[in-house]
């Protein structure tokens, strides 16, 4: 049963004006999701990856958790599991999607990117595209998005080792792109734990990234550029490295995850910050903070409405009996 939840919005910026509470309304679309990670939608049906190894298929009031059959056992480490997930552009015909997951092999953990195919309400691993991306318990990255060029973009974390981010022989701490021949090339370097990708309507690529003890970042990503970690972070500058357009600063932590553009603003899911941040990328200001739902993992816009999922069951939140939840903002 859907229930209306009233939201409070906090306005940030130069004016420091308070806006009226209860101005926005969020509606529960689906409850009891199992550590959801990435929101997709096709023909009004939601497909949401869950870290435990399932895809939550939400069709109206019906929620089905469909099993994902993988070639190796999912890792149960702190931030690991079935993470990034994006439907292929031809999903309606092929029923295929890309996925990013963590697995254990001979006492070590790795990430890989694969193609999944949906058949008889199960998802089968069909092809491995990148394998044995080294990782540890943390900093997997894991966001998958299809760009305006039709190519797959993948964010990969530094696996907890800052040296990886500046190592051109490692995919860790990078954003990579799948080329037409199926190979992957490094698109940008110098990242710590990038978890959000979104394109502005003008084609500009934006990225959200976890900083080290605050200093979370929103970056404009350009091919071949170096974003500086661990040499610079936050508002620091140095020749040859790119400084973010927006940062949380050294005294606040957002832990940003999924991002999307909605009606001209950048919406940012915030885990540690327990909010959906609404940002103006032209001014560099955080204009609103939508709070009261706990940890937020991903955001999604269908052009008309904004949706987000909580992550209160991930071991770091305070879950209610309905968590985790897919919400719709009105």
Predicted regions and their residues:
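Intrinsically disordered, low-complexity segments enriched in polar/charged small residues
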Residues: 7-8, 123
């Amino acid at each position: 049963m859907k229930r209306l939840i009233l939201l409070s919005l906090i306005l940030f910026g130069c004016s420091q004006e308070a806006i009226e509470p209860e101005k926005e309304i969020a509606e529960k679309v689906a409850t009891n999701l199992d550590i959801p990670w990435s929101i997709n939608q096709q023909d009004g049906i939601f497909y949401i990856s869950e870290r435990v190894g399932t895809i939550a298929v939400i069709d109206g009031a019906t929620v089905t958790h469909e099993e994902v059959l993988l070639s190796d056992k999912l890792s149960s480490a702190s931030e690991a599991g079935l993470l990034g997930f994006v439907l292929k552009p031809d999903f309606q015909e092929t029923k295929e999607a890309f996925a990013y997951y963590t697995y254990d092999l001979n006492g070590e953990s790795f990430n890989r990117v694969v193609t999944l195919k949906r058949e008889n309400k199960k998802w089968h691993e069909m092809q491995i595209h990148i394998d044995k991306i080294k990782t540890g318990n943390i900093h997997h990255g894991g966001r998958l998005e299809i760009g305006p060029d039709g190519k797959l973009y993948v964010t990969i974390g530094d696996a907890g080792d800052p040296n990886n981010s500046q190592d051109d022989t490692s995919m860790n701490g990078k954003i990579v792109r799948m080329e037409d021949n199926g190979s992957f090339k490094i698109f940008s370097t110098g990242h710590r734990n990038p978890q959000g990708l979104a394109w502005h309507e003008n084609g500009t690529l934006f990225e959200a990234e976890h900083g080290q003890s605050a200093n979370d970042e929103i970056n404009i990503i350009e091919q071949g550029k170096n974003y500086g970690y661990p040499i610079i972070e936050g508002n620091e500058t140095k020749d040859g490295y790119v400084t973010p357009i927006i940062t949380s600063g050294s005294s606040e932590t957002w832990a940003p995850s999924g991002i999307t553009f909605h009606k001209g603003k950048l919406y940012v899911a915030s885990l540690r910050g327990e909010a959906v941040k609404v940002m103006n990328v032209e001014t560099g200001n955080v204009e609103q903070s939508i709070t009261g739902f706990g940890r937020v993992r991903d955001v999604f816009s269908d052009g008309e409405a904004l949706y987000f999922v909580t992550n209160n069951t991930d071991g770091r939140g305070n879950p209610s009996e309905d968590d985790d939840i897919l919400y719709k903002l009105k």
